Amino acid sequence: MQLSPDDFHFRIDLWDDADKRIEQVIAFVSDLVVALAAYAAAVESKPGKRITLRQRARILDKSFT
């Protein structure tokens, strides 16, 4: 069975500097603990970049204000 992005509850996205479009989907994750760890690693590895952790349309955390 092949999985699709809809099979995962969480995603980590890298946004452009204008916060208008997603430049890269960093990860699709099904487990919250793994999603939080992946988000923390993404923020640490890309300082100053706009990164979000989302559960479907809901933003759980973001690396910018």
Task: Tell me the role of every PLM-derived stretch.
Residues M1-E23:
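Short aromatic-glycine-(Arg/Gly/Cys) micro-motifs in beta-strand/loop hairpins
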Residues L3, I26, A42-E44:
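Sterically constrained small-residue positions within well-ordered secondary structures
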Residues I22-L32:
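A short, exposed loop/beta-hairpin motif centered on an aromatic-Gly-Thr core
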Residues L14, V25-I26, D61-F64:
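A general secondary-structure boundary signal
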Residues S45-T65:
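Short, mixed-charge low-complexity intrinsically disordered segments
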Residues M1, S30-A41:
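Charged, amphipathic alpha-helical segments
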